[in-house]
Each structure stands twice: as structure tokens, then as C-alpha cells.
Design a protein with these regions (language model features):
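Active-site-proximal beta-alpha core segment in soluble small-molecule metabolic enzymes
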Residues: 9-13, 21-22, 26-37, 48-222, ...
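Active-site anion/phosphate-binding pocket segments in diverse small-molecule metabolic enzymes
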Residues: 1-32, 36, 40, 44, ...
Length: 414
């Protein structure tokens, strides 16, 4: 085990950067240099001149939508994708100026505001499109609502059937206040080439139908992270990576051979905590509610101030570990709403105390705890690990020089 040099306390690092202290000693660290590097790597795979529109829905996969989008915009992102209207508005009000696409239907009450703020909307069925056309009929043709048609190619979740796409495109092209801006689909299983090939064939058939109808082809895009990692030829006119922007590989591709350009993807998020208490407990002491764990010897137990209300799921009880001083220690007892306990009895050196930092997600020394590892512990996927990190966990944004911003429930800096 490589010895780890302790960092200055988070309070000092923030103060040195002119930032206020955190309201608690559990926080997420978001590496903006890694974020920019990941975007550059994905752009390299997509190809020269292919627009990259990162997906920043779900609070940028738990990383913080506005700070992440602003950093990506500064790094050259061509636009962004979100899932809901208020997610798009949050970006605009946070200062994001790049184009935004909402990937799910938008209530017609917000059509006018979407057009006025330069936010594109998706349409994937006749009823929803008809309502959007009616709502947009009074819009200024000089500032039309951009509409992107979703095509059902096999995911079974939404979109126009291939046979319906040309008619839908005609309606949009002929409607006052609307502009046909895109044509997209989403893949079901990028690790299965036969399924993906069938979806690509269906998508290409839809493109051909629109071309035969004499309608100018809009921007075509199909590739999220998985498709971009497995087949860069699917870039078409743009790509919309999600998980990979944050340095993570889709779980189904964990053993796949990825493009060399993506070998340097770096996880952006780390979860760090300092104990609020470290105490010696006698043999037979029950730890946390239940209790599902009792000390088998005199033990030194550290209480970390985060729990299932923060996204550290109860399913991690007696399964997970943390890294302290470069080595792993077990997390013991049932995860509580606001606390989880670590057994630090065997940590070498001076007794662990409340100045020690614990890494629950991320790297320290030679050790790394990945989102994929945590996902396996709770029988889920990496997406759920990062998106499940609660808003009440402070986010500290940093670059090579140290902290450059933070977000808590009460303020955002940087």
C-alpha cells in the first residue's frame, strides 16, 4: 500500500480559494479538468466537425447541472440535452447559452417560453405533435420553436413509427411557428450488434422516407455514450454522450474493447467524508439500527455523516468499504438516514480521528472505489449510483489549482 500524504483540511482549501466553509463534513468533489478532458476524448472519437451535445439531465448525472454545463460550454460543448423543461430553464437561468434539447415531451403551456429561450423540444406521437402545433401557431415565425422528431426503432419507449415519420415531418415543416430541427432515436442494447444493426436500419429507413418526401433533412443523431464507444461511424450529424462525459463506462461495456482515444476517460465525481465521531467500543456492541453487526473484539468505530438520504443506499449495509490513509476499511452496521459507520480498528499508525478523510467513491493512493463496484453491491447500474447523490450533499468543484466553486442547498459559488 502506497502511503498517502494527507491533504489540507477542506476548510483550509476552501478558505484559500475565497470560498465559504461547508455545512457538513461529507461532500462530493467534482473534477472539472477531468470533465473537460473527457469531452475532448469523446469529440476525438466522434470525428472532426461533429457536434457534441452532452446530456446533463438529472442534475448532470448528480454532478450539478449548472456548474457542469458552464464548464463544458467553456470547453467547447456544442449544446446540451436534458429530460425536462425545468432542467432546461435551470441551465438558461444559470447562464448557459448553448442550444438545449429536451428529450421528452414538454407540456404545451411551456411551448412559447421554450421558443423564446432557444430550447428545442422533442415530439414522438401524433397527439403530442398536434398539441404542440396548436400551441405554437401564434409564435413569431422569426423565432420558431425547434422540434426534433424521435423515431421508434426498437427501444419500445417512445417515438414515431418509421412509417409515420415522413407525415410528421411534413406537418412540422408546414406549421407556422415550428422548425424541423432534428431526427433522433435511442439504442436498446449497444452491446448486442444485431439489435443495434436492426435499429440503425430502421432509422436509416426513416431518413430515406423524409428525403423522398422532399423535406430537407434535419440534424440526425443516434449515438449516446455506448454507441459512440462501440461504433464511431454512428456519429451522423451529432452525438449526445451522457455517462462517458462523467468518465464512466456503461456497465454492459465494462469488458468491451473501447477506442484507444477513450482509454483516458477519468471519473469526475468523488464522495468524501470526515468522521463526526471516532470511539473505542467493547466486544459485542451493536452498531446502528437493527443491529445487523456487532463488534467481535474491542473496536474503533468512526461515524461518517452521510446516509441513505444522501444517496448512500441502505443496500450498502455491511457490504461496502471506504478508503482511509490509502487502505480500505469496512463499513459496518445498517446504513442510517444520515450516518454510516466504519471499522477503523486495523488502520496502521496513529489512531484514526475526526481529521482523517474517507473516500467512499473515487481514488486515494493505490485504491479506487468505482461507481460500477457500488452498483454491483446494490444490484443496480452505475447511472443510478451517480444520479442518486442527493442535492443536500455539498458539491465542491475543483481544477488543478484547487477548489474553484461549490454548491450547497443555500448557495452556489463559482
Amino acid at each position: 500500500m502506497t502511503p498517502v500524504t494527507p491533504r489540507p483540511p477542506i476548510e483550509r482549501r476552501l478558505a484559500d480559494a475565497g470560498l465559504p466553509p461547508l455545512p457538513r463534513t461529507a461532500w462530493l468533489e467534482i473534477d472539472l479538468d477531468a470533465l473537460a478532458g473527457n469531452l475532448a476524448a469523446l469529440r476525438g472519437v466522434a470525428g472532426t466537425g461533429v457536434p457534441v451535445r452532452p446530456v446533463v439531465k438529472a442534475d448532470a448525472y448528480g454532478h450539478g447541472a449548472v456548474p457542469v454545463a458552464l464548464a463544458l460550454e467553456a470547453a467547447g460543448a456544442d449544446g446540451f440535452c436534458v429530460a425536462a423543461f425545468d432542467e432546461a430553464i435551470e441551465l438558461r437561468e444559470g447562464g448557459v447559452r448553448a442550444p438545449i434539447l429536451i428529450l421528452y415531451p414538454v407540456p404545451v403551456a411551456f411551448v412559447g417560453e421554450a421558443a423564446g429561450r432557444g430550447i428545442a423540444v422533442a415530439a414522438g406521437d401524433d397527439h403530442g405533435l398536434a398539441e404542440t402545433i396548436r400551441a405554437a401557431s401564434g409564435l413569431d415565425p422569426a423565432r420558431p420553436l425547434h422540434v426534433e422528431l424521435e423515431i421508434e426503432t426498437g427501444l419500445g419507449r417512445g417515438g414515431f413509427a418509421v412509417a409515420e415519420v415522413a407525415a410528421a415531418a411534413r406537418l412540422v415543416a408546414a406549421s407556422r411557428g415550428l422548425e424541423l430541427a432534428g431526427l433522433w432515436t435511442h439504442f436498446q442494447a449497444v452491446d448486442d450488434p444485431s439489435i443495434t444493426a436492426a435499429q440503425v436500419a430502421a432509422y436509416d429507413a426513416a431518413i430515406d422516407a423524409i428525403a423522398l418526401a422532399g423535406i430537407g433533412l434535419p440534424v440526425r443523431h443516434v449515438a449516446a455514450s455506448g454507441a459512440l464507444m462501440t461504433d464511431g461511424m454512428l456519429a451522423y450529424d451529432g452525438v449526445r454522450p451522457g455517462l462517458a462525459v462523467y468518465g464512466l463506462v456503461p456497465d454492459e461495456l465494462a469488458s468491451a474493447r473501447l477506442p484507444a482515444a477513450l482509454s483516458g476517460l477519468r471519473p469526475v465525481m468523488s464522495l468524501v467524508a470526515r468522521p463526526v465521531r471516532v470511539v473505542e467500543l467493547p466486544t459485542g456492541t451493536g452498531i446502528s439500527y437493527g443491529p445487523s453487526f456487532r463488534t467481535a473484539r474491542p473496536s474503533r468505530i468512526a461515524t461518517l455523516p452521510l446516509g441513505y438520504a444522501d444517496g448512500w443506499a441502505r443496500a450498502h449495509s455491511n457490504r461496502a468499504s471506504a478508503i482511509v490513509r490509502g487502505g480500505r476499511v469496512p463499513l459496518v452496521g445498517n446504513v442510517a438516514m444520515d450516518a454510516v459507520m466504519a471499522d477503523v480498528t486495523d488502520v496502521a499508525g496513529p489512531p484514526v480521528d475526526t481529521t482523517d478523510e474517507f473516500v467512499l467513491l473515487g481514488a486515494s493512493g493505490d485504491e479506487r472505489i468505482t461507481a460500477a463496484e457500488l452498483a454491483q453491491e446494490r444490484t443496480t447500474i452505475s447511472w443510478e449510483i451517480v444520479t442518486g447523490m442527493s442535492r443536500r450533499l455539498p458539491r465542491v468543484y475543483h481544477a488543478a489549482a484547487g477548489p474553484v466553486g461549490l454548491r450547497t442547498l443555500t448557495e452556489r459559488r463559482g
